[in-house]
Amino acid sequence: DTMVRQLHDGLFPNIGKGDKAAYNSIDAPMWFFWAVQEYDKALGEPGTVWKNYGSKMKSILTAFREGVNPGLRMDANGLIWARQPGKALTWMDAVVRGVPVTPRAGYAVEINALWYNAVCYMLKLAEEAKDNTFIKEWKDMPELIRTSFVETFWNEEPGYLADYVDEKGQNLDVRPNQVFACSLTYSPITDDMKERVLKVVTRELLTPKGLRTLSPKNPKYHGHYEGNQDERDNAYHQGTVWPWLIGAYIEANLKLYGKQFLPEAKEL
């Protein structure tokens, strides 16, 4: 609730507060829907969730659809495009000497997976609350987003999702961000696609401590997080293992394989 009070034009502050707050993270509003979703599951009272957070969640969807923030918008294909010069807008946000190390400008895979999940979840809540105005306004969006997501991110030959897509096309760096398209409650991809994605992630990114942020096969890979600030920032999301990612990896596998994956999940 503290963060909700700081919501502005569909964004939460990344760092700072008040006049010094930096609203430069496109991830946070998308994860807000996930957080409310998890709270809803635990509480078991969707009516309370809608009453407390429905209007705020609506305002986020509207802000992205209408493009109220420079460089952040929902395109005609239903996907979220994000680009601001000199800024890294996703969680891979290291910047060295004014240049994003992992820029990912354009359509980012996890942002659009989270966007699909958010829209689907909001429609579920709206149906339970009988908010027919919202339903009429958004009911066609899930199919549009799902179709566009697959057409934009899926690459059949290697069998995984592009990390991001811009004017130059798909960026096929093997990164963990695609895991969220497999782990979220509402997923825009098929089970067959999930299986293929998870095989690639398991083969190239899985470690006993978490998931690598980049495949060791990639020439940009940094196997050690060390050195001065610039050197560490250059490795921060270019190979460094992040433990928090293992949660989505386990969740994705449990959704796909059920109890069959439990022994492996316990080992992780």
Where in the sequence are the language-model features?
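Catalytic cores of carbohydrate-active enzymes
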Residues: 13-14, 65, 69-76, 116-225
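Carbohydrate-binding/catalytic loop surfaces
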Residues: 12-31, 35, 73-104, 156-180, ...
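A generic structural motif
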Residues: 107, 122, 129, 256-257
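Intrinsically disordered, low-complexity regulatory segments enriched
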Residues: 36-39, 96, 120, 143, ...
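Aromatic (Trp/Tyr) and acidic
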Residues: 94-105, 170-207, 232-268
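Secondary-structure junction/capping motif
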Residues: 52, 56, 104, 110, ...
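Aromatic-rich carbohydrate-recognition surfaces in CAZymes
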Residues: 1-89, 109-112, 116, 240-258, ...
